[in-house]
């Protein structure tokens, strides 16, 4: 979606929210109660106002608080800064929004925005909503409609750090919602006129609600005053749900979305409730209630839903008795609106389920009583949001740990409890006919989005299922196989798994049997319950030093940077045991908002996984790549410019995928589109990562928009094997048919030819006192209250990798000193947000950027070049400079070891180095590290320097050591000698080279370089 369309959609949503509020207040005049935090009408308004102010911010983590403090009076700033439950600037931004609504001053603040566009450009990108004159003018006009709306909002709310509104599970149970507090006159026959703007057309606009984030509202029809509801669209959605496992709208199947507005039948729940309460015996009321087609929505998963209701109903005896009593008296809904909205009430079965054998000629009183129960159960909610994707409120529920497994089997809280806890087995405010696989996913890490619930049982899955045609033999055939082996290891083959109705949070809908080629190829068993990747099974070595060493290595965590470090989230905030792989990237709310704004193509598109991979490894041109899996697309992301932090290199629709090809030893994965027009080769360099990606991809397609049959997964790698055998045969001077490859992997290889030239002096350590660059520059000293910048002259010196800023050339004490090569600095970039030309920023980790300005473009370019060189050189540690490490392929045959580059287009191999296995005398490793040193015999005709090989993780190193030891033992009939690295200087050199490999990988996408606590996308 184009930025202009996004901004138009945001303003359209604000308009709908303001109109709804105005309709209430216009009808009630002076009797209208004030809007409070827990009211649903506030939820959508604040969500869209917050989106408008966040859209285009340069630093989302700080929110718009850094801007609005320039316009806000001091006592209000102090009032917000001392809030005890608001800890972040993003939360303070929303507290300021609440304060502006309370004071009816939001329009005045926006006028200040309009008068200070220069100040806005410092904090927003150029295409931000508030930086567009037309959009800001319309925004101001819409907000002026809130002038006479009364708000009574509490600013000190802990959820403001995560969301602009109160999550459903946080709402007090004993407080009435805004619609329930309205005077009784509003609930009369004029309800249609009050909501006349909310016609079928406007409802269709509202489901396509937000281009930034899924709507947090379950539907306007949940309210006491209701808009029309489309029965035809309900039937369409029920038909769709029998084909798709998730009842998710498929944007690629346009046939399902065509429903004429003339086919819809509006049914207003308010008029039904009032007529039934006033005259329950009238035939008209019964006739109107009979038209409600609840049974057609209930046919999905009917039998299992009944069982769940029977099991769950004893958990709520109080609410059930109260409800039965009310139904017997014939009054109910209007008298107790709070009970009618309690999600615990939805566990009662519908009349069609309880009385299937009832005659159609039953008495009118009995039918009225049953029909009233039918009204209570479905709550007549607008399910369009549920068919499209999870609302943002469900994401907030997950982040707060509301779906913790410890609460799944707990009893419901007593009615007098002040805060609502999620009832077991369903999400808050979720209608009983929704897909429970969306409502209760697995417990997840902090800000982590997953697809598969670890307790979900696939149809027909088991320990002894044969693998499908697209599965490796060592991959289990059931999504729950790994967890069952961990938790139910003693269960026999004949025993059945836990019943579906006893498992809270499992799919209630009966899934269709899938074709054999649609079975999900899952990761190996260990990654589901352990953070450590596990290599594929190979032959066990003889007992000895190598086996013990490998066992110890498996216990060590991978030294790769964890995803928590990538996202700026501390490792302690998530459970490491639930991490499937260190390369999985945890997405927090700020990242998710950025992805929704800049990447996602569909409204309500859901993020499944974000995985860190690479491209070009086998060719020696390693580049970082992020693979983003949603329910519609596979996005391949690269580093972007400053205003757009990342670039969408490709967006591949699941419907475009023809097949997936796995490379040799699962080191690469190739996505091939229909007609083979587009192909994308992704590097994994890790068996466990390849299996994780394949499992995630297949899960995303099954739960997303792709309909069966699913793309085949080819694991034979026939063409790659033939090309590699041909290359090895040429190098070994033998026939291709005689070649046997025991190992193929993507590694970093320290070229011994570079080492043979002698130690290279570290170029990052110039002689003491050497001046790299110095000169007079201007720096931004301060910014006035109205945004006017104040620049001062300074003398800047870059010496020994440290940047010094002095007030004048003659001064001795610097104003500031920055170590360009350490964690203190994150690089430099041009500055487009200042008033001065030729300005650039030095990015600092612990303080705002240092903004400098040169006199000319050439001088600025020279300074930036020197600063970038100082940063890149500073990454290389002091001391012995490590030799360049070449990304390449490593091949082990029966008698030789090869390093080579492979052209992925032509499958042409270029040899980098060759060694005979018989010439290897020993191998040296360090415990818990993924590198090794191969030592060669000095008596061999080919004199070789030691080879240093760096692999992606310890599991890949174990796989390499196993293959190497087996080949060496086949020659000498004894185990290959293993040694430990003891010399401190050599050990430090290898550590430095390893850190250089990792930092070079991160620098390619500007990640984690000196700013672990900052937003990695900035």
Curated annotation (Swiss-Prot):
The keyword Acetylation applies. Coiled coil: none annotated. InterPro entries: PH-like_dom_sf (IPR011993), PH_domain (IPR001849), PH_domain-containing_M2 (IPR053015), Run_dom (IPR004012), Run_dom_sf (IPR037213), RUN_PLEKHM2 (IPR047327). Residues 1-289 are annotated as: Interaction with KIF5B. It is a peripheral membrane protein. It is found in: Cytoplasm; Lysosome membrane. The keyword Cytoplasm applies. Its main location: cytoplasm. Residues 36-158 form the RUN domain. Residues 294-306 have a biased composition (Basic residues). One of its GO terms (cellular component) is autolysosome. Residues 770-872 form the PH domain. GO terms for biological process: autophagosome-lysosome fusion; late endosome to lysosome transport; lysosome localization; natural killer cell mediated cytotoxicity. Residues 210-367, 407-440, 452-520, 526-545, 555-583 are annotated as: Disordered. Residues 230-245 have a biased composition (Low complexity). The modification Phosphoserine is found at residue 423. The modification N-acetylmethionine is found at residue 1. Residues 258-270, 316-325, 347-367 have a biased composition (Polar residues). Interacts with KLC2 (via TPR repeats). Interacts with KIF5B. Interacts with BORCS5. Interacts (via RUN domain) with ARL8B (GTP-bound form); PLEKHM1 and PLEKHM2 compete for interaction with ARL8B. Interacts with ARL8A. Plays a role in lysosomes movement and localization at the cell periphery acting as an effector of ARL8B. Required for ARL8B to exert its effects on lysosome location, recruits kinesin-1 to lysosomes and hence direct their movement toward microtubule plus ends. Binding to ARL8B provides a link from lysosomal membranes to plus-end-directed motility. Critical factor involved in NK cell-mediated cytotoxicity. Drives the polarization of cytolytic granules and microtubule-organizing centers (MTOCs) toward the immune synapse between effector NK lymphocytes and target cells. This is Pleckstrin homology domain-containing family M member 2. It comes from Mus musculus (Mouse).
């Amino acid at each position: 979606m184009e930025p202009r369309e996004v901004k138009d959609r945001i303003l359209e949503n604000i308009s709908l929210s303001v109109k709804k509020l105005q309709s209430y207040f216009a009808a009630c005049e002076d009797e209208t109660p004030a809007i409070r935090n827990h009211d649903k009408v506030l939820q959508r308004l604040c969500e869209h106002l917050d989106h408008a102010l966040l859209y285009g911010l340069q630093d989302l983590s700080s929110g718009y608080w850094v801007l609005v403090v320039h316009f806000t009076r001091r006592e209000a700033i102090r009032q917000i800064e001392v809030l005890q439950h608001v800890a972040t600037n993003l939360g303070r931004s929303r507290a300021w929004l609440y304060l502006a609504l309370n004071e009816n001053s939001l329009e005045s603040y926006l006028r200040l925005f309009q008068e200070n566009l220069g100040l806005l450009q410092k904090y927003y990108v150029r295409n931000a909503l508030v930086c567009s004159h037309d959009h800001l003018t319309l925004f101001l006009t819409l907000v002026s409609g809130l002038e006479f709306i009364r708000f009574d909002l509490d600013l000190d709310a802990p959820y403001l750090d995560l969301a602009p509104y109160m999550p459903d599970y946080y709402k007090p149970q004993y407080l009435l919602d805004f619609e329930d507090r309205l005077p009784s006159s509003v609930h009369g026959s004029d309800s249609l006129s009050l909501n006349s703007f909310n016609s079928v057309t406007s409802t269709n606009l509202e489901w396509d609600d937000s281009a930034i984030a899924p709507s947090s509202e379950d539907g306007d029809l949940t309210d006491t005053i209701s808009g029309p509801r489309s029965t035809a669209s309900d039937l369409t959605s029920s038909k769709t749900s029998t084909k798709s496992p998730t009842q998710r709208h498929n944007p690629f199947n346009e046939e399902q979305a065509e429903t004429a507005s003339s086919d819809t039948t509006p049914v207003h729940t308010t008029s039904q409730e009032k007529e039934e309460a006033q005259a329950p015996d009238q035939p008209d009321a019964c006739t109107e209630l009979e038209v409600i087609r609840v049974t057609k929505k209930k046919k999905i998963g009917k039998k299992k839903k009944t069982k769940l209701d029977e099991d769950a109903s004893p958990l709520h005896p109080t609410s059930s008795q109260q409800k039965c009593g009310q139904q017997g008296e014939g009054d109910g809904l209007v008298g107790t609106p709070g009970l009618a909205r309690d999600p615990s009430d939805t566990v009662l079965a519908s009349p069609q389920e309880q009385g299937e054998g009832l005659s159609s000629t039953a008495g009118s009183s009995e039918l009225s009583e049953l029909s009233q129960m039918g009204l209570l159960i479905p709550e007549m909610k607008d399910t369009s949001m549920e068919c499209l994707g999870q609302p943002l409120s469900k994401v907030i529920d997950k982040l707060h740990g509301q779906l913790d497994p410890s609460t799944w089997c707990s009893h419901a809280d007593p009615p007098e409890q002040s805060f609502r806890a999620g009832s077991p087995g369903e999400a808050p405010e979720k209608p009983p006919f929704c897909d429970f696989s969306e409502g209760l996913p697995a417990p997840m890490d902090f800000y982590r989005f997953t697809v598969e619930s670890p307790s979900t049982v696939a149809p027909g899955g088991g320990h002894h299922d044969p693998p499908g045609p697209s599965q490796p033999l060592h991959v289990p055939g059931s999504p729950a196989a790994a967890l069952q082996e961990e938790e139910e290891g003693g269960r026999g083959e004949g025993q059945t798994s836990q019943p579906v109705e006893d498992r809270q949070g499992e799919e209630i809908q009966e899934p269709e049997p899938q074709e054999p080629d649609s079975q999900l190829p899952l990761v190996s068993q260990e990654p589901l319950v352990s953070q450590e990747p596990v290599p594929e099974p190979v032959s066990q070595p003889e007992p000895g030093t190598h086996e013990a060493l490998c066992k110890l290595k498996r216990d060590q965590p991978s030294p790769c940077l964890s995803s928590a470090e990538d996202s700026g989230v501390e490792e302690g905030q998530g459970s490491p045991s639930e991490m499937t792989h260190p390369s999985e990237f945890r997405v927090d709310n700020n990242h998710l908002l950025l992805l929704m704004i800049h990447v996602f193509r569909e409204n309500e598109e859901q993020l499944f996984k974000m995985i860190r991979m690479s491209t070009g490894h086998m060719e020696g041109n390693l580049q970082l790549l992020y693979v983003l899996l949603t329910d519609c697309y596979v996005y391949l992301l690269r580093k972007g410019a400053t205003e757009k932090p990342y670039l969408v290199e490709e967006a591949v629709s699941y419907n475009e995928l023809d097949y997936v090809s796995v490379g040799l030893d699962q080191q690469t994965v190739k996505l091939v589109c229909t007609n083979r027009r587009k192909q994308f080769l992704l590097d994994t360099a890790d068996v466990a990562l390849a299996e994780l990606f394949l499992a995630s991809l297949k899960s995303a397609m099954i739960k997303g928009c792709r309909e069966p049959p699913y793309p085949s997964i080819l694991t034979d790698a026939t063409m790659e094997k033939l090309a590699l055998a041909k290359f090895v045969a040429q190098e070994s001077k033998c026939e291709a048919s005689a070649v046997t490859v025991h190992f193929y992997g993507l590694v970093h290889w320290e070229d011994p030819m570079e080492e043979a030239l002698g130690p290279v002096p570290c170029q990052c350590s110039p002689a003491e006192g050497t001046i790299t660059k110095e000169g007079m520059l201007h720096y931004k000293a301060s910014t006035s209250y109205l945004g006017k910048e104040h620049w001062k002259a300074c003398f800047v010196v870059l010496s020994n990798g440290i940047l010094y800023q002095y007030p004048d050339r003659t001064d001795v004490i610097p104003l500031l000193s920055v170590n360009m090569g350490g964690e203190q600095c994150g690089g430099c970039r041009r500055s487009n947000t200042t008033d001065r030309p030729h300005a650039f920023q030095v990015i600092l980790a612990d303080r705002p950027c240092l903004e400098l300005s040169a006199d000319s473009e050439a001088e600025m370019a020279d300074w930036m070049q020197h600063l970038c060189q100082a940063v890149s050189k500073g990454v290389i540690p002091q001391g012995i400079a490590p030799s360049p490490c070449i990304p390449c392929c490593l091949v082990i045959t029966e008698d030789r070891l090869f390093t080579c580059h492979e052209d992925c287009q032509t499958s042409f191999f270029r040899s980098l180095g060759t060694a005979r296995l018989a010439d290897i005398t020993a191998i040296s490793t360090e415990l818990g590290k993924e590198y090794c040193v191969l030592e060669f015999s000095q008596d061999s005709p080919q004199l070789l320097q030691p080879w240093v090989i760096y692999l992606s993780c310890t599991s890949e190193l174990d796989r390499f050591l196993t293959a190497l030891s087996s080949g060496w033992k086949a020659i000498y009939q004894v185990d290959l000698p293993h040694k430990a690295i003891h010399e401190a200087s050599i050990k430090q050199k290898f550590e430095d080279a390893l850190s250089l490999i990792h930092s070079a990988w991160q620098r390619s996408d500007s990640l984690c370089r000196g700013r672990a606590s900052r937003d990695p996308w900035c």
